[in-house]
Design a protein with these regions (language model features):
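N-terminal glycine-/serine-/threonine-rich beta1-alpha1-beta2 phosphate-ribose binding loop
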Residues: 1-96, 215
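Active-site-lining helix/loop region of Rossmann-like oxidoreductase modules
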Residues: 9, 13, 151-275
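Gly/Ser/Thr-rich loops at beta-strand to alpha-helix junctions
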Residues: 12-14, 82-83, 107-111, 137-143, ...
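Aromatic/hydrophobic pocket-lining residues that form π-stacking "cages" and hydrophobic walls in ligand
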Residues: 89, 121, 207
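A short hydrophobic/small-residue beta-strand
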Residues: 99-101
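Rossmann-fold NAD(P)-binding glycine/threonine-rich loop
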Residues: 104-130
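Alpha-helical support elements that line or immediately flank enzyme active sites
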Residues: 141-152
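C-terminal helical cap and adjacent loop that interface with cofactors, partners, or active-site loops
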Residues: 272-303
Length: 303
């Protein structure tokens, strides 16, 4: 059986972590990495934790040079958060007759906010005989797919609360920017007001996935709240820094209503170095129904 040939598109914190993981696996060969700027022409091993050793070198190339028909079996797309931004890249890969796994948060359930693009991706994949999967720890598993699985033991479901208390420390600069790490409280509030601060991307997708799986029709658009987590001590992670008095995280909630009643609530406080201030991470699925479910996993599943 031939090894699965993989191209990684984007070698930031996420793509680099995927490379390190794949290099531990059997049956998989990384045959290319797509990057940009000064990274092009350099070795993948210059940007990841794994030493090259006696492995063949993998040079970072441009998308124009690397995206050829059937150049790999699958492309891991480790760029973007939003379906509209990921779509042009997905289209290029699919038209080269390669499968796609995307880590873009909205791609976990793209029909929630981009139904037309989701339909177009489905059409392109079928035309080219390949598949497109959007997934991740969250969204993609902890606050949605796991919730759906846990409802499988219920005769009836009345309401759902999914809570994830997690550390942002492993994430790269893009996530630090989206979450407002290191900015002042005034800057955070202004970013929330004018929509330039994204915070967690995925409530629409997670709530949409859970509602569709149960058979609930949302009676109103998903809403969310967003508050700064202000640190009283300096905190530093590999890609972020927040001095005392500034923003070290973002506490967000998402709400899904059915027939005017709150049925799905998501509670998601995230911050860098939570342990530094005594915050214990964890994942929680609380289902009110028959029977009730109270699933706790602490510390969090990292990711």
């Amino acid at each position: 059986m031939e090894n699965v040939k993989v191209i990684i598109w984007g070698l930031g914190a996420m793509g680099g972590g995927m490379a390190d993981m794949l290099l531990k696996k059997k049956g998989v060969d990384i045959v290319g990495v797509i990057g940009r700027g000064s990274k092009i022409g350099t070795s993948m091993f210059d940007y990841i934790k794994t030493e090259r050793g006696d492995r063949p070198d993998v040079l970072i190339q441009s998308e124009e040079d690397l995206l050829k028909e059937k150049a790999a079996d699958v492309v891991l797309l480790c760029t973007d958060s939003f379906t509209k931004d990921a779509f042009p890249k997905i289209k290029k890969v699919v038209e080269c007759k390669m499968n796609v796994v995307s880590s873009a948060e909205e791609m976990a359930y793209p029909k929630a906010q981009s139904p037309e693009l989701a339909a177009e991706i489905d059409k392109l994949a079928k035309e080219n005989g390949v598949s497109v999967l959007g997934t991740g720890i969250n969204p993609g598993l902890i606050m949605d797919l796991l919730v759906v699985v846990m409802t499988g033991c219920c005769e009836e479901v009345e309401s759902i609360l999914a809570r994830r208390v997690n550390s942002l420390s492993p994430f790269g600069p893009a996530v630090m920017h989206e979450q407002g790490i290191g900015i002042t409280v005034d800057e955070f509030n202004k970013g929330v007001e004018d929509g330039t601060l994204a915070g967690h991307v995925g409530f629409h997708e997670s709530i949409g996935m859970v509602a569709d799986a149960i058979g609930w029709k949302l009676s109103a658009p998903v809403t969310q709240s967003m508050e700064p987590i202000v640190t009283d001590v300096d905190r530093k992670s590999p890609y972020g820094f927040a001095k005392a008095g500034d923003v070290a995280g973002c506490a967000m909630k998402g709400f899904g209503y059915v027939d005017g009643e709150l049925k799905i609530e998501m509670d998601h406080p995230q911050q860098i170095e939570p342990e530094q201030v005594g915050v214990q991470t964890g994942d929680y699925v609380i289902i009110k129904g028959t029977p009730n479910v109270n699933m706790v996993n602490s510390p969090e599943v990292p990711g």
